[in-house]
Amino acid sequence: MSSLNDLITRNYNNFRGVDFSNNNVSFSRSPDMLNMWRDYQDSDCIQTRPGMKLLNTFNNKILGLFFYIKEDIQHVLVHVGPKLLKWTNYPNMPATTQELYTSMNIQESRSFVFDNILFIMDGINYLEYDGETLKKVEGTVPMTSYYKNPDGSTSIDSDTDIDLVYQPVNCLTSLRKNAFFGDGKSAKYQLDAQELDSVSKYLMEATINNVKKVENIDFIVDRDKGIVTFNDIPEKDSEVVITYSKTGKDHLNRILNCTLSCEFDNRIFFSGNPNYPNSVFHCELNDPRYVRDTAYYECGLNLAQVKAIIPGNNVLWVLKDLEQNSSSLYYLTPTLDSTYNKIYPSVNGSISLGCVSCGINFNDDVVFFSNKGLEGISNSSLYSEQILKHRSSLVDSKMLSETGYKDVKLAEYKGYLLCLIDSHIYLADSRKKFQNNSNDIEYEWFYWELPFSITFIKEYRENLYLGNEIGQLFILEGKTDNSKDINSHFTICKDNFGYQGYTKTTNKRGNVVDFKIMNNDNIKIDTIVDGTIKEKTVLSDKNEIVPFRIKDKKFKEIQVRFSSN
């Protein structure tokens, strides 16, 4: 056991990240670290974060940034205020842009690529872009009945005498097709719906053995009864296909007003519609232009909004806002079905702690933000029970006090989960984890402060893009923040050397620090003695091992802070 006169040597190393918990901070963590991280692609050292380089200014709020490659040509689209722009000379500055659309929603948009087509949604629009043309998504026209006799009854040649429905109604289009076999006697054909849309909305069409027929020229329509009368009676066994329009109640807006989407099981799932707070919709297999009117699932009965839909562990997790006396977690499991091939019944989870902002599948860890911080979902066998595992105790005291906490935005970047809140970024490190006192696995964290308020964040091919309210778009690179110095520091935890009540004196032999050589001539070292800054020393990192001295007497605890701009 050491006596009071013993020389105690400290070796501070294997630094892991920050600890803002105000508890006993480990020697490997810092209670006060700013704008530093570990770039695993470069070295294992803690170093200053990259800078922010201005790419362009678009004179309105950045709400979306989309990269799309078609035939080896990269297309860059930017959602700026109410406009969707094509950045034709990316990444050159100033930007040369082409307006593709001028009625975008003033909220953050999202995208996905399906069958080499870029699809974009913003809460009021559902658009597609093929590299040349941007247009509203045109829904696949379903064949809602077939093998019909002219009177609408089932054909005697069919395999069954029940009324067959070939394809359900598509929410993304008002159009439907009916197929018949002509009997050589009937001019009137009964459709499978009545009270059709007016002729001003859609002039009906038909084909007889693939020969096009047009309303008011080749046939007339009784829209109230859904009856088509041909001028010339179709021949026996001729194939008659009639296309008509019947708008379903709020069908289109079910999907257009969704604010969340994700790909799962070769389908696109949609949710977040404020008018359908419990609903999750999905498209048909490999067809994002077709959302049948029965393809939705109710997650709960309350008005708590769905905040996140996250694929993970072969299910789709549905996370809702906090609601008293009700589960906030549901999951949809792919299930074989004789009618629709696949359905996704909703199962009530066992977690009631609500999601207050968003969530993500972070390297196979399904996480979301509650009013207590970042939570991870762990499963018992067969999903019979879900268990919450806390992931952010090291930064909760600071992160939860952020005024914009409920509007946190997420991006994965170089193995980190970046949690953006205004101008602050909290970085969860997927490669450094620890087990807390409750045996939960948590992340190590870093913390950045940016010189500009940032409202948009996106990662693409290991590049990080940041946008703001005034239309500035930055990329994370370089050694300055758009020519401004980056102030960074790392403070070792308070150390009383095992004797809290006794005073100490530093040894005259001094200290050494192991630097990564970055040719920085302005590394400042401060000593913080019993809470007061005492000394300042300026060092250079031209050598890897650099000696320095600390001269302090009669202190109870001491810290060392390294800083640089």
Which stretches of residues belong to each language-model region?
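Hydrophobic or amphipathic alpha-helical targeting/insertion segments
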Residues: 108-157
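A general sequence property marking short-to-moderate contiguous segments
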Residues: 47-50, 140-177, 283-289, 392, ...
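Extracellular Ig-like/FN3 beta-sandwich strand-entry sites
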Residues: 235-239, 555-557
